[in-house]
Amino acid sequence: MEKYKIAFFTDLHIGVHQNNERWLDVTYKWAKWFTSELKEKNINKIIFGGDLFHYRDEINVKTLHFTDKLLDLFDEFELYMIPGNHDAYYKDNATVHSLSILNNRKNIKVFDKPTAFNLASKQIGFCPWGTSIDDVPTDCDMVVGHFELENFNFNNHKICEEGMKSQDILKKSKLIFTGHFHKRQQRKFEDGTIIYAGNPFEMDFNDIKDQKGYYVLDFEEENITYDFYENNVSPIHVKVTLSELEDLQAIAKNKGWSNLSIKIIIDKEIKINLLDKIISSINYEGPFALTTDYLNKLTLGDNISIPNDLGDLNIKECIVE
């Protein structure tokens, strides 16, 4: 085994989308891929940056049962975990958290208080959700947290306007790895580097075109190094306008229909019956999910025959100009 290499991932959100079975399946398939990747790299240590579960107030029994099965995939690994805000009962601290149910697993260590811990020759500061800047351990080679840092992106559309300041957290360590924000971000400052690892796979349309995956950290040298490995196995989200729907073919050819969660933006006037048949044609291809968003009006249409195969469909002929 690689003594000095440690994997990092965060924000798994088990039970996302109302404990939907299909999303549990996405999570399980990702975990099988992830653990297989680490075994190939001879890595048996993993740090997790918070938000194992999605719902903080209660956890579905089916989701609990699934989590037990999921964690069996990690039996050969050492897991070092912190609770995130979705794991915490209280909104501002992690004194009561759902990761306590993992205490019976000997390969898992949960840090629910700010703690400096020696791991593979490095001093790591573990900071659960709600850790104040004053309580972040000092003189650490790296700090792991679930921080809300000012001027970083929550996602592709929203920036955090209030939170901890980067210059304050970098006084504690020159390297910060954190969960919480789902957009993967890596910023270098004069005093060090802050990395939001992001969620391991896309979970909604806010994640569009954001690289997902995991990091591998190397603790062997004095300065910690790290590499990012992209997840190419999980479904992605795609927004496409009706007028550019033909672009969907190329995306599907590359990724596969079953790995596409699609939102069609109705940006042109179209006859209702034609839109219904277009949607049926796409559903025939078997996408992971399909929704529509209406920016334009619909009109009553003629009874025009449209084939099931999307490849034979002329979208432009269906649009009312």
Question: What residue spans do the PLM features occupy?
Answer:
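Beta-strand-turn-beta hairpins that frame and shape the catalytic cleft
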Residues: 1-7, 116-126, 138-142, 190-194, ...
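Accessory, non-catalytic peripheral segments of nucleic-acid enzymes
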Residues: 2, 40, 219-321
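Core catalytic region of metal-dependent phosphoesterases/phosphodiesterases
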Residues: 3-5, 12, 16-116, 169-173
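Structural motif
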Residues: 6-8, 47, 126, 142-146, ...
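Histidine-centered catalytic micro-motifs
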Residues: 12-14, 144-148, 174-184
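Conserved catalytic scaffold of divalent metal-dependent phosphoesterases
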Residues: 67, 87-168, 197-200
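Conserved beta-sheet core of the metallophosphoesterase superfamily
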Residues: 156-222
